Regions:
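Short glycine-rich phosphate-binding loop at a beta-alpha junction
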Residues: 46-61, 204, 256, 334-337, ...
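Short proline/glycine- and acidic-rich turn/helix-capping motifs at secondary-structure junctions
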Residues: 369-385
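A glycine-rich phosphate-binding loop feature that marks nucleotide/adenosyl-phosphate handling sites
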Residues: 133-137, 248-249, 264, 336-343, ...
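Conserved RNase H-like, two-metal-ion catalytic cores of nucleic-acid enzymes
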Residues: 1-90
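Acidic, glycine-rich two-metal-ion catalytic cores of nucleic acid-processing enzymes
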Residues: 11-37, 137-139, 146-148, 152-237, ...
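A structural micro-motif
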Residues: 52, 70, 198, 333-334, ...
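Helical catalytic core of nucleic-acid polymerases
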Residues: 63-147, 182-301
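Extended hydrophobic-aromatic, low-complexity segments
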Residues: 150-152, 256-259, 287, 335, ...
Length: 385
């Protein structure tokens, strides 16, 4: 187990350093000091490749300062994947130093106080288990985070938090919700390309939830038709009215008058079957990465379905981000913002081939995308490549 202590309590991980590490095999604990004033300091980094498994508290932040290795897993995400408790209360001293806005708080907080906090994490370390989930989430989201969003004032950095009810990450930092930037107030206009003559490219999945559900229930939606239009034609309604009907069926339960439509009948059957399994087994697992969702009296069958659907969306996207991170075209272009059913890229002027490769990866297995391009994030125009 590795417990990294960053120098700053408030700065983004890219703008701080590792103050110290506490490392434990469950029996022996080792404090490695780089910047804390309480002890002798060293310079050497720890070599983690010799360990079989390395569970890190806050792996996404840790990877700003250490290279990823295949033996690394996030402790909290490992417990979350198993539906086990991963909550550790922060000690009061950290709250005190936050209020003081001390820029190097963790260099000043006594070592024994850090060790007290570490002990609370150590108590739950024994429940950790290897999973792709606890490795790919912090690795993939951290990779996008590091790329930053470029503005005329420099870079802004997002902060993804996947420890939510559905594993769909929130993304708020310094008061800005990057997962829900408004389209009509000009706030997006500050985000531009970092490259000379570069542009921003955004790929949006068409009717993402509809197509994800279709995969779950074995219904084929034509790739050359928009998913919402495909359903609208079955209602005999215009698109705007049809969308409202669709959302009502998917998130509130299928109404009798739409039960004759195969897509909704099979969706309803899937929801009911999953709910019975949930009641019988007191848990279900997500379709791709097998994360457990335990019984909760506050859940009903439609809420459970929404949790599973959002988890499916996120898990597929995490696998996509992992594949994108392995593209090797000697490109400079990078993904800079992930927002559930779309990914925004900063693309160098000579790298259209990169976007073509990205599009191919994102569309695999029948998930068509739409492409928008712009000089800034507020002025994006649909295009074809």
């Amino acid at each position: 187990m590795v417990y990294p202590i960053l120098t700053s309590l408030d700065k983004h991980s890219i703008h701080t350093r590792i103050s110290a590490l506490i490392i434990s095999d469950g029996t022996l604990d080792l404090f490695i000091n780089y910047h804390n004033i309480d002890a002798t300091k060293i310079d050497e980094k720890v070599e983690f490749h010799n360990f079989k498994e390395v569970y890190i508290v806050g792996m996404k932040d840790f990877l700003y300062h250490y290279h990823f290795l295949p033996n690394m897993y996030d402790l909290e995400m490992s417990l979350f994947w198993q539906a086990k408790n991963f909550d550790v209360d922060e000690k009061p001293i950290y709250t005190i130093f936050r209020r003081r806005q001390a820029p190097k708080a963790n260099d000043l907080i006594p070592i024994w106080k850090h060790y007290e906090q570490f002990q609370d994490w150590k108590k739950i370390f024994g429940d950790s288990k290897i999973s792709k989930f606890s490795q790919l989430y912090p690795k993939s989201l951290g990779w996008v985070e590091k790329n930053g969003l470029y503005t005329n004032m420099g870079y802004e950095y997002t902060r993804y938090n996947p420890l939510t009810m559905t594993s769909r990450p929130s993304n708020t930092f310094k008061g800005t919700n990057y997962a829900a930037l408004k389209k009509d107030d000009g706030v997006r206009s500050r985000f531009i390309s970092r490259f000379e003559n570069g542009k921003l490219y955004q790929l949006d999945f068409d009717g993402y939830h509809i197509r994800l559900i279709a995969k779950l229930i074995g219904v084929d939606i034509p790739l050359d038709k928009k998913a919402h239009e495909w359903l609208a034609n079955q209602y005999g309604k215009d698109l705007s009215e049809a969308k409202a009907i669709t959302f009502r069926q998917l998130y509130g339960g299928v109404e009798d008058e739409y039960y004759h439509i195969t897509f909704f009948k099979k969706t309803s059957d899937y929801i009911n079957s999953m709910w019975l399994d949930f009641l019988r087994n007191r848990e279900v697992v997500t379709p791709i990465l097998q994360r457990k969702i335990k019984f909760d009296e506050n859940l009903n069958k439609n809420k459970l379905f929404n949790y599973v659907l959002q988890a499916l969306e996120t898990e597929r996207n995490i696998l996509i981000l992992d594949k994108l991170s392995k593209i090797n075209l000697n490109q400079k272009s990078v993904p800079i913002l992930y927002t559930y059913d779309s990914i925004l890229f900063d693309v160098d002027s000579n790298e259209d081939n990169y976007i073509r490769e990205v599009k191919k990866i994102m569309e695999k297995d029948g998930f068509p995308t739409q492409l928008e391009v712009g000089k800034d994030y507020d002025n994006m125009v649909k295009t074809i490549i």
